[in-house]
């Protein structure tokens, strides 16, 4: 009809309204953006406006089959050759939760390994859409992922803008890129696993993760369940955050060291969450890591808070100093997270990394390491107990 809307246009508008109704999360407040800029993390409770929608998302994750064929009680360890195997391809295409597989580099042996983590299962929402469409139809009897699919689409369209809008008036506020190609979403069920200390953005040309956003969907969570995430802003207090229902935990992927405590006694299928990674501004990242060696040496003459502030904001400085500064914590978390075959490789590589730093021939950089260790030993911030 002339002047009127076509059927397709009306259908699209209805879908947009339904999306807003189902997925319009509570606005990200400027106070959360300010806390993120100042402390490196923020917590947003009751993130999904409609609690029933969050419950449906949890139920859809729990309806997905878990594929535990990759191993037994020990870690599955593979040496990588840079090529994708047939098994890797099938993992991408199959709509099942698969064992978490962690890349680990042993610099001393110049080898990269792939470890399957016991008790942690994941599904990447970027896997083939055809598989997801089949799941929607319920043709395989597994239930649908319709709500998760719509949430996935909404994160690509709106989540980056939500953070950017909240940070407009915040000094050094976060800036992330909107769009489907600039975010990753993974679903996860944890039936008894843990994660050692790490950064979500390990660096490299292909990594531009800026924000990690974890939405927890554990309605019956109790403290005895464990599974907390522990964040460690450099030289700050250890922040333990419980994975309670409809809680969004946000932190900088490249500069906030963190681990996950072992999940135990979770009701149902286990600890359920989904993680969204948002990419940052490329130009901004290039500026930050210009010459960390000279910057660190020059800051030796400055007050400790200036050195700490610089390290917190500089990804390459964090990667250089974190194992040295928190070497005991790294080791303990490895022991608690990898009880199988991968543990020996990881402990050896960790010890080797620390030893190589001790043997650095750059006297000024050695002074930086000594200064950082002295600051850690006298750090009163760590005495604070933060549990959220």
Please give the residue ranges for each predicted region.
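Catalytic core of Fe(II)/2-oxoglutarate
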Residues: 193, 202-204, 208-209, 218-372, ...
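Eukaryotic intrinsically disordered and solvent-exposed regulatory patches
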Residues: 28-30, 198-201, 237
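Non-heme Fe(II)/2-oxoglutarate
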Residues: 20-169, 291, 326-329, 336-349, ...
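Intrinsically disordered, low-complexity segments used as extracellular stalks/linkers
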Residues: 9-18, 72
